[in-house]
Design a protein with these regions (language model features):
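FAD-site-proximal beta/loop scaffold in flavoenzymes
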Residues: 1-19, 105-177, 181
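A Rossmann-like FAD-binding core segment of flavoenzymes
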Residues: 43-140
Length: 232
């Protein structure tokens, strides 16, 4: 809440200034891309926006169509994208970025961190639970190895053989529903059913009145004719 209030205050103050401020968004996933486009549409000239992404492409776990539309949206808005880059240090006025060319120190006014999810497993410091990618490894029934009466779902877990599933609400909700049904089966003395993810598609907001939708065999770029709104 403190960080959100700080960001809100910074953006409101920036709306009333002609200064060209340098804003860095760390993370080229959905949150980072949506935020970059939205801020640029609201504050057209106040910011130089830079998106920092550690991999070689933005939205690397999202659908190709949405990624391509996002790249076009960023280019149209003159938002800089720094690929294969990571943040080494952030000070009051500088941000140090490590890339293929070395470490570069750049001036900054604000840094917004959207670089993904890392669960806190400090309370599970034990060799009896197998972990992968910093998450609890489970089978396709969500059972923890060697602990068949213990289950893990959502951001804290990774399903063996399904490591590429995105960390999204859609996946977590389906996991929750499936686990609830499996628990009922187990209570009845029946075998649990393996989880199968049903991809219902995804939508990425690309600024004011613009979005990319991909799924269920359909790819759409939506652009609203409505006027630009303002920051309130």
């Amino acid at each position: 809440v403190h960080d959100l209030n700080k960001l809100n205050s910074f953006l409101k103050k920036s709306q009333d200034t002609a200064l060209h401020k340098k804003l860095f968004i760390v993370g080229g996933g959905p949150s980072g891309i949506e935020l970059a486009c939205k801020i640029k549409d609201i504050f057209t000239d106040q910011f130089e926006i830079n998106v920092i992404e550690k991999s070689n492409e933005i939205l690397n776990k999202n659908k190709i169509f949405n990624r391509e539309q996002a790249e076009k949206a960023l280019e149209k808005r003159k938002i800089n994208v720094l690929l294969n880059s990571t943040v080494k240090e952030v000070s009051e006025t500088k941000i140090s970025i490590s890339s293929e060319v070395g470490i570069t120190s750049l001036d900054k006014d604000i840094v917004i961190w959207t670089a993904g999810v890392k669960p806190n497993l400090s309370y599970l410091e034990t060799d009896q639970i197998t972990k992968k990618f910093g998450r609890i490894l489970v089978n396709n029934n969500f059972q923890i190895e060697n602990h068949k009466n213990c289950f893990a779902i959502g951001d804290i877990s990774v399903i063996e053989g399904m490591e590429d599933l995105p960390i999204t609400a859609q996946v977590a909700m389906q996991e929750g529903n499936h686990l609830a049904n499996n628990l009922e089966l187990l209570i009845q003395g029946k075998d649990p059913l393996p989880f199968e993810f049903q991809d219902n598609g995804e939508m990425i907001s690309l600024g004011i009145g613009e979005a990319s939708i991909s799924g269920l065999g359909v790819c759409l770029l939506y652009t609203s004719p409505s006027p630009r709104d303002s920051y309130g």
